[in-house]
Amino acid sequence: MSKQIPFLLDTTSEIPKFRAETFWTKEPETIHWINRNLNESTDIGLLIDVGANIGIYSLYAATVNNSISVFSVEPVPDTFRELNANIELNMKTNQISTFMVALSYESGSGTLKNVDPRLGSSGAQIQIVASGDNASTKVLSGDRLLKDEWEKRDHGKKVMIKIDTDGNELDVLNGFIEAFKDGSIVTVLVETHPNNRNEIESFFRSLDFHEDESYLSVEGHSNYRREAKGNGERTKVYVCPMV
């Protein structure tokens, strides 16, 4: 019998059911990253879950540490509705804030491409377009999100970011450049791809962040499963110089 997940989830649809059943085994490094960084003595006050989907990692983080805040970012409307339903199901609306926007290197408008109609699916990507050109999706930079929704809370807590946007990760990172430079962000878990991995590495190196390779020893790390299947995606964890 599989280990029960520590939060409630609507599993009436196929993909959410799969996500619940594979929660502990699909990306154990993400669970380890959350556990390590959200211990009782943490100085982290906010997790930004970029590409939150139906909210499994947002909910897990909020369960591990009920004093932190979570920003769940999900631009696909049907998935966003399911995300909110799951948060309400767990009575976490005071802890988890949701945003039906896409994050990128600048604020504006865009269109979603490659949207799979199945609830809880992944793969959608944002394409920034001129306002009015069928631009149905709001786009924000991470710095704008933080300025509008986090800085007004007037505290010095640090930020951790999880990014899984199926190829747009570098654009998302560039949108947080001010927060990186002012020391707000202390660790990032990011899914990388063959076409952006070197640029992401260069981005972090320019900020004196380094990859924490200790996560590669987590049993069942998704990188090894992906490699065995010929999948080019790799999850990496980067930390600031002080960590």
Q: Across the structure, where does each feature detected by a protein language model lie?
A:
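Conserved S-adenosyl-L-methionine
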Residues: F99-V101, F209-E219
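Conserved beta-strand signature within the Rossmann-like core of class I S-adenosyl-L-methionine
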Residues: S184-T192
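Hydrophobic pocket-lining residues within nucleotide cofactor-binding pockets
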Residues: V101-Y105, T165, T192
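Core alpha/beta nucleotide-donor-binding catalytic domains of modification enzymes
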Residues: N84, E88-M91, I96-P117
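Short internal loop-to-helix segment that lines adenine-nucleotide cofactor pockets
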Residues: E21-I48, Q95, S109-T111, Q125-G183, ...
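S-adenosyl-L-methionine
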Residues: M1-Q95, W150-R153, L216-V243
